[in-house]
């Protein structure tokens, strides 16, 4: 028999002990200290307080008078916040909300309760938005919370054009203002915005802030200002201020030629869930700049998340929602020639893309799990519409709305019908949802749905885009009336793609010119608005052949499609079948340019050392 001592940890005993301490606290048994705040008494146990708070631990172990007292008065402490901290000490439970978190953080900071501080930090970082980021920046600076401060600062930089007129911005300290105005990461397209922000802050309290005139104006990069702005600005200055302004601008001279981050952003086509060349991952995300004809790597959604909904807001915020993730401990075969052996779980995840950090940031999940929901932004809210789900027909009808300021979802009126697939667009603050030959319009202010005119053709997996007061429904698969067989829209051989246009003012559909694609083009195109033009991104080769992509542009007056750009095979390789495509403005300097390399399936088994690419013969690299 082994003499080795056997040790087991009884976790149930630990839980029981905590419950017993809580019972003693509630019944005021064996208490040995009374905390007094604003006339309210809190009988407690020194041992419990010292366990969670460095402040109380130092107080009770110092040997000073407080360590021997039975009653301790705490000043500058909020009674409600103290009650929450005491409850946490006895239970480990902490209910944080918008109305209590800042006072709770302040009290926990004074009492040095690190667990509560961490919970509050995580909550505040998650809640940062354009409405509160400036205030939270000042709050974090006051309490020396560097993690919260950096997160708030990034949001101020990202939303600068929306926040620099806020009252909280006017009340920023001089040091924080300089930190912001000097940042290379300001998301501004013109330096005039920075100049205006600086002048507004100085003029908010001219008497007390005149001493900062030189230091504030030295953050303006005068070379980036237009000549008209420079001349008008100097002419409008009081004579006594001109020398100070010149001195301040002279200090900014070394930064003259460095543009702000927002001045470098490019409108790009963003591809989510593209086929991945990485054997350890199913999917990848890339973006393509039509101006530079370059492809950049985008941070892929966490945990191989796929079958998501995507949306880009008018403020250029990118969100994804729903989808599926692979289950853990399941065998996965990522080979393109083998059948996938992965089990998936449907999720209600919701992420915001931090373009400066090139990372996905989790937000409050949706109320329902959804696969490929339609996402749109209407009147400042994000709507998640339908999508396939595990809840059957009822769940497919559900619609929920996300409040970006409150970071919360609420349900709205459901769809009149249940669909596994739909496309949605926004025109004149109304949401239009389409599938097959049906279309419904949602009016947010009355929370109601109305059936609109039916289309002339019944198509699934089409792409929809709003352009002016018109809705374009393009491509997809035509549903044969009798057999239900899905055929390419337009011609059977894929040499043209069907287009229908809806006029929201007349409530009527009409056929438009087909897209003159090549034979065997993929009918499931992606319609986007880029550079203020309606375009279609499509694959002009059969799915079994090498991928060749093009974009077509539509001329509304002439009702004609023309080839806009042929995308070189050197730039963009096979994206697969199910990728999402949207358009947003991104910063090339924050992305990694994707290097060109010949795909493995181009290597010929007969030993050929070159192949044709874009009409040229390209030699394979040496092995």
From Swiss-Prot:
Presence of keyword Cytoplasm: no
GO BP annotation list: gene expression; glucose metabolic process; lipid metabolic process; phosphatidylinositol 3-kinase/protein kinase B signal transduction; protein K48-linked ubiquitination; regulation of cellular response to insulin stimulus; response to insulin
Domain named BACK: residues: 133-229
Pathway named in the protein's UniProt entry: Protein modification; protein ubiquitination
Domain of life, source organism: Eukaryota
Keywords for this protein: Kelch repeat, Phosphoprotein, Repeat, Ubl conjugation pathway
Ranges occupied by Kelch repeats: 317-380, 381-429, 431-469, 470-529, 535-581
Gene disruption phenotype: Mutants exhibit growth retardation, hyperglycemia, insulin resistance, lipodystrophy and hepatosteatosis. Double knockouts for KBTBD2 and PIK3R1 have increased body weight, restored fat storage and decreased blood glucose and insulin. Adipocyte-specific knockouts accumulate PIK3R1 in white and brown adipose tissues, causing insulin resistance, moderate rather than severe hyperglycemia, sustained hyperinsulinemia without late failure of insulin production and lipodystrophy leading to ectopic lipid accumulation in the liver.
Modified residues (Phosphoserine): 300
Residues annotated as signal peptide: none
Gene Ontology CC entries for this record: cytoplasm
InterPro entries to which the protein is assigned, alphabetical: BACK, BTB-kelch_protein, BTB/POZ_dom, BTB_POZ_KBTBD2, KBTBD2_BACK, Kelch-typ_b-propeller, Kelch_1, SKP1/BTB/POZ_sf
Reported tissue expression: Expressed at high levels in muscle, liver, brain, heart as well as white and brown adipose tissues.
Domain BTB stretches: 31-98
Gene Ontology MF annotations: ubiquitin-like ligase-substrate adaptor activity
Signals that turn on the gene: In adipose tissue, expression is inhibited by diet-induced obesity, the inhibition is mediated by leptin.
Role summary: Substrate-specific adapter of a BCR (BTB-CUL3-RBX1) E3 ubiquitin ligase complex that acts as a regulator of the insulin signaling pathway, modulating insulin sensitivity by limiting PIK3R1/p85alpha abundance in adipocytes. Targets PIK3R1, the regulatory subunit of phosphatidylinositol 3-kinase (PI3K), for 'Lys-48'-linked polyubiquitination and proteasome-mediated degradation.
Domain free text: Recognizes the BCR (BTB-CUL3-RBX1) E3 ubiquitin ligase complex substrate, PIK3R1, through the 4 tandem C-terminal Kelch domains.
SUBUNIT field: Component of the BCR(KBTBD2) E3 ubiquitin ligase complex, at least composed of CUL3, KBTBD2 and RBX1. Interacts (via the BTB domain) with CUL3.
Protein name: Kelch repeat and BTB domain-containing protein 2
Gene giving rise to this polypeptide: Kbtbd2
């Amino acid at each position: 028999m082994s003499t080795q001592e056997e040790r087991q940890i009884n976790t149930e005993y630990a839980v029981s002990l905590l419950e017993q301490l809580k019972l003693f606290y509630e019944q005021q048994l064996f208490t040995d200290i009374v905390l007094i705040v604003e006339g309210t008494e809190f009988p407690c146990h020194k041992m419990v307080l010292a366990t969670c708070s460095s402040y109380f631990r130092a107080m009770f172990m110092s040997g000073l008078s407080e360590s021997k007292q039975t009653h301790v008065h705490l000043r500058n402490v909020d009674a409600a916040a103290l009650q929450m901290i005491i409850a946490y000490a006895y239970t480990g439970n902490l209910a944080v909300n918008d109305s209590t978190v800042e006072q709770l953080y302040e009290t926990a900071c004074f009492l040095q309760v690190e667990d509560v501080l961490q919970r509050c930090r995580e909550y505040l970082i998650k809640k940062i938005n354009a409405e509160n980021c400036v205030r939270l920046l000042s709050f974090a600076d006051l309490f020396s919370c560097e993690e919260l401060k950096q997160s708030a600062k990034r949001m101020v930089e990202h939303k600068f054009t929306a926040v620099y007129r806020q009252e909280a911005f006017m009340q920023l300290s001089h040091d924080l203002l300089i930190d912001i105005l000097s940042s290379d990461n300001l998301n501004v397209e013109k330096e005039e915005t920075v100049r205006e922000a600086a002048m507004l802050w100085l003029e908010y309290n001219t008497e007390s802030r005149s001493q900062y005139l030189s230091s504030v104006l030295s953050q303006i990069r005068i070379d980036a200002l237009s000549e008209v702005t420079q001349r008008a600005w100097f002419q409008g200055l009081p004579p006594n201020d001109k020398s100070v302004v010149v001195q301040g601008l002279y200090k900014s001279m070394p930064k003259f030629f460095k543009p702000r981050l927002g001045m470098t952003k490019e409108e790009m086509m963003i591809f989510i869930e593209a086929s991945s060349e990485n054997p350890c991952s199913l999917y990848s995300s890339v973006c393509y700049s039509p101006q530079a004809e370059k492809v950049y790597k985008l941070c892929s959604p966490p945990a191989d998340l796929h079958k998501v909904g995507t949306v880009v807001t008018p403020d250029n915020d990118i969100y994804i929602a729903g989808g599926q993730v692979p289950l853990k401990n399941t065998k996965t075969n990522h080979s393109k020639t083998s059948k996938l052996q992965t089990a998936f779980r449907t999720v209600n995840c919701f992420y915001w893309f931090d373009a400066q950090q090139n990372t996905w940031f989790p937000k409050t999940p949706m109320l329902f799990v959804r696969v490929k929901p339609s996402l749109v932004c209407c009147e400042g809210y994000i709507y998640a519409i339908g999508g396939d789900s595990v809840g059957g027909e009822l769940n497919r009808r559900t619609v929920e709305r996300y409040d970006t300021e409150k970071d919360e979802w609420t349900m709205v009126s459901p769809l009149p019908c249940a669909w596994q697939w739909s496309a949605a667009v926004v025109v004149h603050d109304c949401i239009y949802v389409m599938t097959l030959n049906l279309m419904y319009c949602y009016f947010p202010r009355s929370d109601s749905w109305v059936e609109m005119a039916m289309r002339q053709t019944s198509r699934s997996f089409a792409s929809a885009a709003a352009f002016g007061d018109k809705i374009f429904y393009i491509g997809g698969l035509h549903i044969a009336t009798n057999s239900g067989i899905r055929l390419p829209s337009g011609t059977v051989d894929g040499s043209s793609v069907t287009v229908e246009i809806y006029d929201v003012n007349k409530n009527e559909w009409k056929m438009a010119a087909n897209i003159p694609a090549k034979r065997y083009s993929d009918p499931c195109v992606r319609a986007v608005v880029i550079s203020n033009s309606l375009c279609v991104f499509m694959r002009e080769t059969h799915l079994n052949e090498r991928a060749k992509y093009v974009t077509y542009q539509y001329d509304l007056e002439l009702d004609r499609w023309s080839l806009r750009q042929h995308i070189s095979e050197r730039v963009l390789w096979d994206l697969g079948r199910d990728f999402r495509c949207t358009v947003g403005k991104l910063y090339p300097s924050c992305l990694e340019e994707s290097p060109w390399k010949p795909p493995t399936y181009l290597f010929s088994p007969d030993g050929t050392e070159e192949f044709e690419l874009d009409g040229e013969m390209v030699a394979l690299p040496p092995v």
